[in-house]
């Protein structure tokens, strides 16, 4: 409210006049009151509020107080807010009060304009500039971030589009061919054309493929029309059917084609890589690991898991050489085909025996007890049984034409190990003799019913096929035996390089993995003696394996057998240089076959078959590695420390003096001969000399002298921790039919009968020894 008022100056004491009769001033004047200091007016007549009321009563339109000297007057004025005045009351101080007082003091009259405004509250103060500045800064930051994100997405999208274009360019395209038209092979074994035998309509446009129409084949093997799937792939980068990402496929960098599939399969196998330590027979210092991968696992006939290990091979066999140890280069390939092997054997080789139903497999400790006779397998089953892993390649990759290529099939499972089309035999290989006509005589009936093939070195890791039974004939070779490696639960890298995978996995000093012994696990069965050689219609040259003789008070239950050559784990073995000389005793009346280090070959009139010991009329090739029956002729090299035992070397097998311990002159042995000496001078020859316990030695000598049947020959010390060993009484004999010349061993009492031709061989051998030993004669007895 603004008003023009006539100023009327009044003295403050004039307001203290209480005389009501005094004339009132004309209405419209403004009273100006200068308040003095409180110290000067100790007893004011009226308060500041009372003075304002007095002025209003006298007709003042407004009252102005100068509170420069008395600032407390504001509080006194605020006390009358409950009863406000009808006229405005204004207080002034500072420069405004000085100016006003100057005007009042110098002029008689003046005009004043009073403008009323409400007081400002402190909360109402707000600076819009600060807010605007802050808002602008935040907006700029957000805008910059959005721009950067957008640019990054655009660059990523451009990169993905470029990668999609590149992946699309590298994808193969094929032309659709109608049914009946010939399709040609692609570079990787795939087809450049697609026939209508597969899905013949596009999953995008739902139209059928037309002959000659170009189709896009995605790496996931789904195919569509090129015009339909290309825009989708460029935009979404995935297969419309299975959502396979083509960009991720490109990032893998494997490339299209068959090599990509094989490499992806190799990466899956790499996750379960197994390193198998492999020792080769006769090569003491040359051993090396072989990398293999588990390909499949199945259950054996006894409920044990069998895992097939495949040896690592390069993707392109033509581009990469076979990973073969150099020291195997000297071994010649051996074909599995009878027609190409040059060996014609009329003996029958029955399949592996099936274990009785309901008999649980039990892994026993190796102490020679509870094992069965070595089954008389054919050489084609034996020599490839433990030396090859699936996919392992060996040198001499020669092609074999016709039906000779890869005919190693057992029960529908392919066991051949392709190195060219031949299988290669590490030497020396232990041959097994042929089976008899009676299936029972050579079948395995041990307590755990486990078919143990005693031949060569074998790592105690799963590396065989899962075939439950072996039924291949002699014309079919076996590259691996599932039953000789049934217990695959201990798939460790500790190798037991023995001849039977059921042996305990131990590399202690008791075991010498480079020593052979001529002892096959004995046959059990509660004295179930097989038929004699004449029973059952045995064929020509058939050899029958029976239970072995036993000796009283022997600490072990090992049975001595001539069926196979095994490793000795508890014998006194020695490693000798190839030039070392081993002594042997006089062995009369036996066929002789010795390969001297100097190259001289002394043999009898006829030789036995390398696999089944069938006599052959002709001279076999000098390049083959063979086994011979009968004792070794005497050599004038001095007496031996242990008798009746075998010594095995890479060049020659010796037989020690038979008169000291076992003491029987006509005891047979399996002689192994490798006509070709080793190519390496640093190779060691392995010799074996079995030592009997002192208590059992005398008993063994006495028993042999009497030729008592049913006594075990102690070879391996007693294993007290073994459980479940079966003791029985049996006898052993080797019988030949007709006019065949062969050794007949002791059956009942002192028999030791020899055929006429065998005695002739023994006499010819005695002439060659020329005074080396005396007192040993060939004993002739009547045949039963």
Swiss-Prot record:
It catalyses: S-ubiquitinyl-[E2 ubiquitin-conjugating enzyme]-L-cysteine + [acceptor protein]-L-lysine = [E2 ubiquitin-conjugating enzyme]-L-cysteine + N(6)-ubiquitinyl-[acceptor protein]-L-lysine. Its main location: membrane. Residues 150-784 are cytoplasmic. CDD domains: RING-H2_ZNRF3. It is an enzyme of class 2 (transferase). E3 ubiquitin-protein ligase that acts as a negative regulator of the Wnt signaling pathway by mediating the ubiquitination and subsequent degradation of Wnt receptor complex components. Along with RSPO2 and RNF43, constitutes a master switch that governs limb specification. This is E3 ubiquitin-protein ligase ZNRF3. The lineage of its organism: Eukaryota, Metazoa, Chordata, Craniata, Vertebrata.
């Amino acid at each position: 409210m603004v008003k023009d008022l006539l100023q009327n100056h009044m003295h403050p004491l004039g307001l203290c006049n209480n005389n009501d009769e005094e004339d009132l001033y004309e209405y419209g004047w403004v009273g100006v009151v200068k308040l003095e200091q409180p110290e000067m007016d100790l007893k004011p007549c009226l308060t500041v509020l009372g003075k304002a009321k007095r002025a209003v009563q006298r007709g003042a339109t407004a009252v102005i107080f100068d509170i420069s000297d008395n600032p407390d007057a504001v509080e006194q004025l605020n006390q009358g807010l409950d009863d406000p005045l009808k006229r405005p009351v204004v207080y002034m101080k500072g420069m405004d009060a000085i100016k006003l007082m100057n005007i009042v003091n110098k002029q008689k009259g003046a005009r004043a304009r009073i403008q009323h405004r409400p007081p400002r509250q402190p909360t109402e103060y707000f600076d819009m500039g600060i807010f605007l500045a802050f808002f602008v800064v935040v907006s700029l930051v957000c805008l910059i971030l959005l721009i950067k994100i957008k640019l990054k997405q655009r660059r990523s999208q451009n990169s993905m589009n470029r990668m999609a274009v590149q992946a699309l360019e590298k994808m193969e395209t094929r032309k659709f061919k109608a049914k009946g038209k010939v399709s040609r092979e692609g570079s990787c074994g795939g087809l450049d054309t697609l026939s209508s035998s597969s899905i013949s309509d596009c999953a995008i446009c739902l139209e059928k493929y037309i002959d000659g129409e170009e189709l896009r084949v995605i790496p996931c093997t789904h195919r569509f029309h090129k015009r339909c799937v290309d825009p989708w792939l460029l935009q979404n980068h995935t297969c419309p059917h299975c959502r396979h990402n083509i960009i991720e496929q490109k990032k893998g960098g494997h490339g299209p084609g068959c090599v990509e599939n094989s490499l992806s399969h190799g990466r899956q196998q790499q996750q379960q890589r197994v390193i198998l330590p492999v020792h080769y027979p006769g090569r003491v210092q040359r051993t090396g690991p072989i990398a293999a991968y588990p390909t499949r696992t199945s259950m054996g006939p006894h409920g044990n898991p069998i895992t097939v290990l495949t040896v690592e091979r390069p993707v392109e066999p033509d581009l990469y050489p076979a990973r073969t140890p150099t020291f195997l280069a000297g071994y010649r390939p051996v074909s599995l085909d009878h027609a190409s092997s040059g060996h014609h054997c009329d003996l029958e080789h029955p399949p592996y025996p099936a274990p009785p139903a309901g008999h649980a497999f039990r892994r026993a400790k190796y102490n020679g007890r509870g094992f069965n006779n070595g089954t008389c397998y054919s050489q084609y089953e034996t020599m490839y049984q433990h030396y090859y892993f699936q996919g392992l390649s060996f040198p001499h990759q020669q092609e074999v034409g016709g039906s000779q290529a890869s005919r190693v099939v057992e029960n529908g499972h392919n066991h051949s190990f392709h190195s060219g089309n031949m299988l290669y035999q590490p030497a020396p290989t232990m041959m097994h003799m042929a089976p008899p006509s009676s299936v029972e005589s050579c079948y395995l009936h041990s307590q755990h019913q486990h078919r143990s093939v005693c031949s060569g070195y074998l790592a105690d890791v799963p590396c065989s096929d899962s075939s439950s039974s072996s039924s291949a004939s002699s014309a079919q070779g076996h590259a691996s035996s599932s039953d000789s490696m049934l217990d695959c639960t201990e798939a460790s890298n500790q190798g037991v390089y023995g001849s039977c995978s059921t042996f305990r996995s131990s590399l202690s000093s008791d075991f010498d993995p480079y020593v052979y012994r001529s002892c096959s696990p004995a046959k059990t069965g509660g004295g179930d003696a097989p038929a004699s050689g004449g029973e059952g219609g045995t064929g020509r040259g058939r050899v029958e394996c029976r239970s072995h003789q036993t000796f009283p008070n022997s600490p072990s239950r090992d049975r001595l057998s001539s069926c196979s050559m095994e490793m000795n784990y508890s014998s006194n073995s020695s490693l000798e240089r190839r030039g070392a000389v081993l002594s042997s005793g006089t062995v009369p009346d036996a066929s002789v076959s010795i390969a001297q280090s100097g190259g001289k070959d002394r043999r009898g009139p006829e030789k036995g078959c390398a696999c089944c010991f069938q006599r052959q009329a002709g001279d076999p090739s000098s390049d083959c590695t063979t086994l011979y029956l009968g004792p070794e002729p005497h050599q004038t090299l001095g007496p031996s420390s242990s008798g009746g035992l075998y010594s095995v070397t890479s060049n020659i097998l010796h037989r020690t003096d038979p008169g000291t311990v076992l003491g029987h002159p006509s005891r047979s042995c399996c002689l192994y001969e490798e006509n070709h000496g080793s190519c390496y001078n640093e190779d060691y020859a392995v010799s074996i000399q079995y030592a009997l316990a002192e208590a059992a030695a005398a008993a063994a000598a006495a028993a042999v002298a009497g030729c008592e049947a049913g006594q075990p020959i102690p070879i391996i010390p007693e294993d007290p921790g073994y459980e479940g060993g079966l003791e029985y009484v049996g006898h052993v004999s080797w019988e030949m039919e007709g006019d065949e010349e062969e050794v007949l061993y002791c059956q009942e009492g002192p028999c030791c009968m020899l055929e006429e031709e065998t005695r002739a061989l023994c006499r010819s051998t005695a002439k060659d020894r020329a005074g080396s030993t005396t007192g040993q004669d060939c004993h002739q007895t009547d045949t039963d």
